[in-house]
Protein backbone atom coordinates (compact mmCIF):
# COMPACT_ATOMS: atom_id res chain seq x y z
CA UNK A 1 0.00 0.00 0.00
CA UNK A 2 1.36 3.45 -0.96
CA UNK A 3 2.14 6.19 1.46
CA UNK A 4 -0.70 8.67 1.97
CA UNK A 5 0.49 12.22 1.32
CA UNK A 6 0.09 14.36 4.41
CA UNK A 7 -0.83 17.99 3.89
CA UNK A 8 -1.29 20.57 6.58
CA UNK A 9 -2.91 23.98 6.80
CA UNK A 10 -0.80 26.78 8.25
CA UNK A 11 -2.49 29.67 10.09
CA UNK A 12 -0.93 33.08 10.65
CA UNK A 13 -1.97 35.73 13.17
CA UNK A 14 0.16 38.61 11.86
CA UNK A 15 1.02 41.50 14.12
CA UNK A 16 3.30 44.53 14.07
CA UNK A 17 5.32 43.22 17.05
CA UNK A 18 4.74 39.46 16.99
CA UNK A 19 3.28 36.93 14.59
CA UNK A 20 1.69 33.70 15.78
CA UNK A 21 1.73 30.50 13.74
CA UNK A 22 -0.37 27.37 14.08
CA UNK A 23 -0.64 24.21 12.00
CA UNK A 24 -3.09 21.40 11.62
CA UNK A 25 -2.30 17.85 12.61
CA UNK A 26 -1.39 15.63 9.61
CA UNK A 27 -5.07 14.84 8.98
CA UNK A 28 -6.32 18.44 9.23
CA UNK A 29 -8.52 17.62 12.22
CA UNK A 30 -7.25 20.03 14.88
CA UNK A 31 -4.93 23.00 15.35
CA UNK A 32 -1.56 22.99 17.12
CA UNK A 33 0.60 26.02 18.00
CA UNK A 34 3.89 26.41 16.14
CA UNK A 35 5.18 29.49 17.94
CA UNK A 36 5.46 33.25 17.93
CA UNK A 37 7.99 35.07 15.79
CA UNK A 38 9.10 38.60 14.87
CA UNK A 39 7.14 39.78 11.81
CA UNK A 40 10.29 40.83 9.96
CA UNK A 41 11.48 37.18 9.98
CA UNK A 42 8.17 35.47 9.27
CA UNK A 43 8.74 34.73 5.55
CA UNK A 44 12.06 33.03 6.39
CA UNK A 45 10.39 31.10 9.24
CA UNK A 46 7.61 29.93 6.91
CA UNK A 47 10.15 28.86 4.25
CA UNK A 48 11.88 26.74 6.88
CA UNK A 49 8.53 25.31 8.03
CA UNK A 50 7.62 24.41 4.43
CA UNK A 51 10.90 22.51 3.98
CA UNK A 52 9.81 20.15 6.76
CA UNK A 53 6.03 20.10 6.21
CA UNK A 54 3.73 19.73 3.23
CA UNK A 55 1.20 22.58 3.35
CA UNK A 56 -1.89 22.72 1.15
CA UNK A 57 -3.11 26.15 2.25
CA UNK A 58 -2.13 29.17 4.31
CA UNK A 59 -4.82 31.08 6.15
CA UNK A 60 -4.21 34.57 7.46
CA UNK A 61 -6.22 36.34 10.15
CA UNK A 62 -7.92 39.30 8.48
CA UNK A 63 -8.73 42.19 10.80
CA UNK A 64 -12.11 43.80 10.28
CA UNK A 65 -14.13 46.04 12.54
CA UNK A 66 -17.20 44.54 14.22
CA UNK A 67 -19.36 46.08 11.46
CA UNK A 68 -17.28 44.35 8.77
CA UNK A 69 -15.43 47.46 7.60
CA UNK A 70 -11.68 47.65 7.13
CA UNK A 71 -9.37 49.26 9.68
CA UNK A 72 -5.75 50.52 9.51
CA UNK A 73 -4.31 47.04 10.14
CA UNK A 74 -6.31 45.60 7.21
CA UNK A 75 -4.07 47.39 4.70
CA UNK A 76 -0.97 45.99 6.38
CA UNK A 77 -2.43 42.48 6.16
CA UNK A 78 -3.33 43.01 2.48
CA UNK A 79 0.36 43.79 1.83
CA UNK A 80 1.44 40.76 3.85
CA UNK A 81 -0.92 38.48 1.89
CA UNK A 82 0.60 39.80 -1.37
CA UNK A 83 4.07 39.09 0.02
CA UNK A 84 3.06 35.54 0.99
CA UNK A 85 1.49 34.88 -2.42
CA UNK A 86 4.66 36.07 -4.17
CA UNK A 87 6.97 34.05 -1.89
CA UNK A 88 4.87 30.86 -2.09
CA UNK A 89 3.02 30.96 -5.45
CA UNK A 90 2.04 27.27 -5.34
CA UNK A 91 0.19 27.54 -2.02
CA UNK A 92 -3.18 29.30 -1.86
CA UNK A 93 -3.40 32.06 0.76
CA UNK A 94 -6.85 32.69 2.22
CA UNK A 95 -7.78 35.56 4.54
CA UNK A 96 -10.26 34.72 7.30
CA UNK A 97 -12.04 37.06 9.69
CA UNK A 98 -10.06 37.29 12.92
CA UNK A 99 -12.43 39.60 14.79
CA UNK A 100 -12.10 38.87 18.50
CA UNK A 101 -9.58 36.03 18.15
CA UNK A 102 -6.93 37.64 20.38
CA UNK A 103 -9.50 38.44 23.06
CA UNK A 104 -10.83 34.88 22.92
CA UNK A 105 -7.27 33.49 23.04
CA UNK A 106 -6.60 35.58 26.15
CA UNK A 107 -9.67 34.09 27.84
CA UNK A 108 -8.54 30.56 26.95
CA UNK A 109 -5.09 31.20 28.43
CA UNK A 110 -6.61 32.67 31.61
CA UNK A 111 -8.92 29.66 31.94
CA UNK A 112 -5.93 27.34 31.52
CA UNK A 113 -4.56 28.69 34.80
CA UNK A 114 -1.39 30.29 33.41
CA UNK A 115 -0.13 33.27 35.38
CA UNK A 116 -0.15 36.68 33.69
CA UNK A 117 3.65 36.53 33.40
CA UNK A 118 3.58 33.13 31.67
CA UNK A 119 0.73 34.21 29.37
CA UNK A 120 2.78 37.18 28.19
CA UNK A 121 6.09 35.34 27.93
CA UNK A 122 7.13 34.39 24.39
CA UNK A 123 3.90 35.75 22.97
CA UNK A 124 1.72 32.80 23.92
CA UNK A 125 -1.30 34.93 23.11
CA UNK A 126 -0.25 35.24 19.46
CA UNK A 127 0.22 31.52 18.83
CA UNK A 128 -2.99 30.81 20.77
CA UNK A 129 -4.84 33.30 18.55
CA UNK A 130 -3.45 31.55 15.44
CA UNK A 131 -4.65 28.21 16.88
CA UNK A 132 -8.13 29.59 17.48
CA UNK A 133 -8.29 31.02 13.95
CA UNK A 134 -7.29 27.66 12.53
CA UNK A 135 -9.65 25.64 14.72
CA UNK A 136 -12.52 27.96 13.79
CA UNK A 137 -11.61 27.54 10.12
CA UNK A 138 -11.55 23.74 10.44
CA UNK A 139 -14.93 23.70 12.18
CA UNK A 140 -16.49 25.95 9.53
CA UNK A 141 -15.14 23.90 6.63
CA UNK A 142 -16.19 20.56 8.12
CA UNK A 143 -12.67 19.30 8.81
CA UNK A 144 -12.78 19.25 12.61
Curated annotation (Swiss-Prot):
InterPro entries membership: RNaseH-like_sf (IPR012337), YqgF (IPR005227), YqgF/RNaseH-like_dom (IPR006641), YqgF/RNaseH-like_dom_sf (IPR037027)
NCBIfam families xrefs: RNAse_H_YqgF (TIGR00250)
Protein's UniProt name: Putative pre-16S rRNA nuclease
Keyword list, A-Z: Cytoplasm, Hydrolase, Nuclease, Ribosome biogenesis
GO CC entries: cytosol
Superkingdom in the source lineage: Bacteria
Family designation: Belongs to the YqgF nuclease family.
Molecular function via GO: nuclease activity
Cellular compartments annotated: Cytoplasm
SUPFAM superfamilies (UniProt xref): Ribonuclease H-like
Amino acid sequence: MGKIPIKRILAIDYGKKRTGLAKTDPFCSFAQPVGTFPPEKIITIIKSFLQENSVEKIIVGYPLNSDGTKNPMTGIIDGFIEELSAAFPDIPVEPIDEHGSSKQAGKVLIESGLSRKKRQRKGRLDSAAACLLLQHYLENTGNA
